[in-house]
Amino acid sequence: MGTAGKGAWVVPAPAYREVEGWEGAGDDSPGFRCGHSLTVVAPTKGHGPRLILFGGATAIEAGASSGMPGIRLAGVTNSVHSYDVDTRRWTRLHPAGEPPSPRAAHAAAAVGTMVVFQGGIGPAGHSTDDLYVLDLTNDKFKWHRVVVQGAGPGPRYGHCMDLVAQRYLVTVSGNDGKRVLSDAWALDTAQKPYRWQKLNPDGDRPSARMYATASARTDGMLLLCGGRDASGMPLSDAYGLLMHTSGQWEWTLAPGVSPSPRYQHAAVFVGARLHVTGGVLRGGRAIEGEGAIAVLDTAAGVWLDRNGIVTSRTLKSSHDHDASSDLLRRCRHAAASVGTQIYIYGGLRGDILLDDFLVADNAPIQSEFTSSMYDRVPRAENQNRNHNFNSDSPTTNNSTDKKSIDMLTQASAAEAEAVSAVWRAAQEASHASSEDSLSEGIGSESPLSETSPMPEDLDDGGSLEPDVKLHSRAVVVSKEAVGDLGCLVRQLSLDQFENESRRMHPSSNDQSYPAKKALNRQRSPQGLHKKVISFLLKPRNWRAPAERAFFLDSYEVGELCYAAEQIFMQEPTVLQLKAPIKVFGDLHGQFGDLMRLFDEYGYPSTAGDITYIDYLFLGDYVDRGQHSLETITLLLALKIEYPENVHLIRGNHEAADINALFGFRLECIERMGESDGIWAWTRFNQLFNYLPLAAMIEKKIICMHGGIGRSINTIEQIEKLERPITMDVGSIILMDLLWSDPTENDSVEGLRPNARGPGLVTFGPDRVTEFCKRNRLQLIIRAHECVMDGFERFAHGQLITLFSATNYCGTANNAGAILVVGRGLVIVPKLIHPLPPPVNSPESSPERAMDATWMQELNIQRPPTPTRGRPQSASDRNSLAYI
């Protein structure tokens, strides 16, 4: 963990306000409540993200011994209420199955579209330590009790629990009725039979406490904050719990000075910022003033209140309160975050039970400060291709327990795999029925929105002469002989590209890397981007470094990301660009290919061609290849140097829950060290949330990473997506934009299920024609899929797929290509072929051996699939084979 240097970019804690316009009358509204839980569940097919409120007390009474109000156990409930973030409506749920007993002061954690509950206290005393699962999948609500073998944490209340590293349910501290506890337990949701494991972490262990909070950061660190010790003293410390690659857990004391000690507070992560609200001091006195709202910025290593960085624990007097601080003068409330918004419900203020509903928005546009540290890293609440449920199964204990175990495993795997973030729908038990159920939800007709009518004055377009034309010949750099860097350049007729329809997809199984994370910081001198360009932009002379250590430290990565982020924040979601321009497809960390393309066809420098042609990159800068760090840092540096000429949009791998699995996080750790590497990886992913999502060239060509899918009918739909944006708040439009693909060929029309996973689609040529006609476009350029010749035409030439990395995953043997769009909108493909393997080349053998090892290890984890048209093995059908 580090501390922030001077001038660190931090944003004060946000202001809270009451949620406006929410609905929920009568029994649907949770009403007065304290000691409850509030948990965010991933979107389902029929709903967007939802908040699940469970349990808690509906009445209070004066404490006999303390004179302070406490919960009335007779008023404790087990009711379940759901708040739909999109519709702003509260609904009381009545799930099938045997519910847990009424309880308060329990612990809850989300696993995909399920919520796990454990412990608590109610009218019957301490609740058991059984795990109860509320399954919301497929919008069929049902309770399940999960069977766990062996000893566990035991009955307790006032403890905390969260899902760590998208895999481990970790519960910490609490009170078992006899003593205050300091232990930590973990349950691996990917291993059956389920067993609790008592952890023995290294490092600075936190003292025994209850009424603390524990929140998991997206990259897998659990942050324990505050609490009350055995003597009743409130605590002000915070500890990070993380698991190293060896499997050993470690506690680390968080830096900084917290605004106040506290317990019975609420805390939730938004990106790298832990938002802490409310709580009480010794004797139950509510925290007042600025201390009622706090943020621990784990990236900058500082605590903040409403005024900025906290340097000493001096609470303001009551006349300094702002309205937001007064609202948060409460305890026993609950909080959850959706995107950049933090929601709070209920609680206790003195002897007054609350039923209000609050929200704060951490979006940078609403802040008068600029910060690089606070936008949200996407939650790994994404979807599992193997995630199959049968909600109509018999309710006998044996079958329920078995199915609930399977469901919990599959849900946690869904988090770890993180592929279909918005559209994980529950499938039937078999792979075949999974495909069938998806097919039933996707018809062959294109679901064009009735609210987006075609322009009345637009005719069929058959009589119009198109302005955009694909040149009849492509420029090709032939395969290079060893030692021959001259490169034979030739032109081929497009008719000679026999492999043009051979699209290919990388694959994987459902394994995931162990969690590795830390707290850290950043900052660096001015002009850093020039250093990066000078060091990396060597099109003819670049060689992979013999030493794997990266030449920038996390301090400099933070500076680079901040400078680029300020530019991206000022750009529209859909860029408006002019020709001439070069368009690049997926690079996937293959920095050598980027240098070859620059060398052969010009590079962005005043010594190159930047003075008369722009550059557009279509995303997927990281993962798979061995030099993702070089690729993304150079592109960011070029963006800073030439902000009006170099353009970057987002790909599906520019998301933490994807690039945690496919090499980028591992590369950061291996080349920068674990602490600096995880911090840098997190910082890059924060920046990715600001990237533009599409680009228009001369208002006639639209460029995107994935496609139009089933939901995108107008460019305005893309323009309305507000950044920073994460997969879980972007919904179907963002998912289609980054993930959808064309169908197999022009003969397959409409929509079809996409082999990449549940909820993802392929779109036919009819969709392309309708979209272009509706938006007065002549061409779609997209990336996302490996194609044998580096580019591929679809929909009678109205769509081109572009891929710039050669020999993808070290096995594809595909060419890489760029498209050069001239002033007359004539498009010329320019290709490079894969380099042949070296023949006893001592100079290149060590680095190529490293390349081979890197590819082999990653391909074992995520094996590439056969080329387009070859049969797919049954074992791969529900894997990550297609990311």
Curated annotation (Swiss-Prot):
Residues bound to Mn(2+) 2? 620, 652, 705, 784
Cofactor info, note text:
Binds 2 manganese ions per subunit.
UniProt keywords (A-Z) are: Hydrolase, Kelch repeat, Manganese, Metal-binding, Nucleus, Protein phosphatase, Repeat
Its protein name is Serine/threonine-protein phosphatase BSL1 homolog
Quaternary structure annotation from Swiss-Prot or TrEMBL: Interacts with the phosphorylated form of BSK3.
For this protein's source organism, the top of the classification is: Eukaryota, Viridiplantae, Streptophyta, Embryophyta, Tracheophyta
Top enzyme class: hydrolase
SUPFAM superfamilies linked: Kelch motif, Metallo-dependent phosphatases
Residues of the active site: 653
Q: Where does Mn(2+) 1 bind?
A: 586, 588, 620
Checking InterPro entries in the record gives: Calcineurin-like_PHP_ApaH, Kelch-typ_b-propeller, Kelch_1, Metallo-depent_PP-like, MPP_BSL_C, Ser/Thr-sp_prot-phosphatase, Ser/Thr_prot_Pase_BSU1
According to the lineage, what is the superkingdom? Eukaryota
Where do the record's region annotations for Disordered lie? 381-402, 430-466, 499-525, 861-883
- Catalyzed reaction equations: O-phospho-L-seryl-[protein] + H2O = L-seryl-[protein] + phosphate; O-phospho-L-threonyl-[protein] + H2O = L-threonyl-[protein] + phosphate
Cell compartment(s), UniProt: Nucleus
Q: Which cofactor does it need?
A: Mn(2+)
Any one Gene Ontology molecular-function term assigned to this protein's record: metal ion binding
**Short name of any one Pfam family annotated for the protein:** Kelch_1
A Gene Ontology term for the protein's cellular component? nucleus
Compositionally biased spans, kind Polar residues:
385-399, 872-883
Q: Name one GO biological process term.
A: brassinosteroid mediated signaling pathway
State the organism named in the record: Oryza sativa subsp. japonica
